């Protein structure tokens, strides 16, 4: 792996408008080769998508997905910049794919890491700090282990961090950025709601043997 310097990361950011972490990843994947890293970002749809990410996305569409058997349903709001793009095939296909992703991810609660409340982060930290396998470890080492575990746990709660169900080499965030690059507009997943049939309803549990016995006495 090549020497990934801060200057190299800055140069790639200046050329592409991509985020720092995306640039670092691209350079690591291409052993520090700037031209190859630029191409890597373009293939991922990140290079041009990042430049659009600051623009207002107030149009869009609300999509729905009902899973086979009608036991899971999803409503999802996907935003873009113009109504024309919202009606297009690329946008509508993305809306369907992301809605399907939510249906397949019952543990996902938030769109992005930024949406996770501080109290949730703190609760996860307390849980991890109290685990038996950390007892006796120096505080500094314990903090690093907990930090890694929390990051992993929080990503499990976030839609954009999920591996895309149709291509696990991509995340949902990658998928959105690729669509934004193709369309030439900013695209944002605004919010979603996932419904599961019977969720929250307390069901009566009947013992099968008791049920048969009661039928025989009638």
Curated annotation (Swiss-Prot):
Report keywords, A-Z: Cytoplasm, Elongation factor, Protein biosynthesis
Question: A GO molecular function for this record?
Answer: translation elongation factor activity
Give GO cellular component annotations, separated by semicolons: cytoplasm
InterPro entries linked: EF-Ts_dimer_sf, Transl_elong_EFTs/EF1B, Transl_elong_EFTs/EF1B_dimer, Transl_elong_Ts_CS, UBA-like_sf
Which N-terminal stretch is annotated as signal sequence?
none
Question: Where is the chain membrane-spanning?
Answer: none
SUPFAM superfamilies to which the protein is assigned, alphabetical: Elongation factor Ts (EF-Ts), dimerisation domain, UBA-like
Involved in Mg(2+) ion dislocation from EF-Tu: where is this region?
82-85
Q: Report any Pfam family annotated for this entry.
A: EF_TS
Where found, per UniProt? Cytoplasm
UniProt cross-references to PROSITE patterns, sorted A to Z: EF_TS_1, EF_TS_2
Q: Coiled coil located at which positions?
A: none
Query: What PANTHER family does the database record attribute to this sequence?
Result: ELONGATION FACTOR TS, POLYPROTEIN OF EF-TS, CHLOROPLASTIC
| Role, per record | Associates with the EF-Tu.GDP complex and induces the exchange of GDP to GTP. It remains bound to the aminoacyl-tRNA.EF-Tu.GTP complex up to the GTP hydrolysis stage on the ribosome.
Protein name per UniProt = Elongation factor Ts
Source organism of the structure: Prochlorococcus marinus (strain MIT 9301)
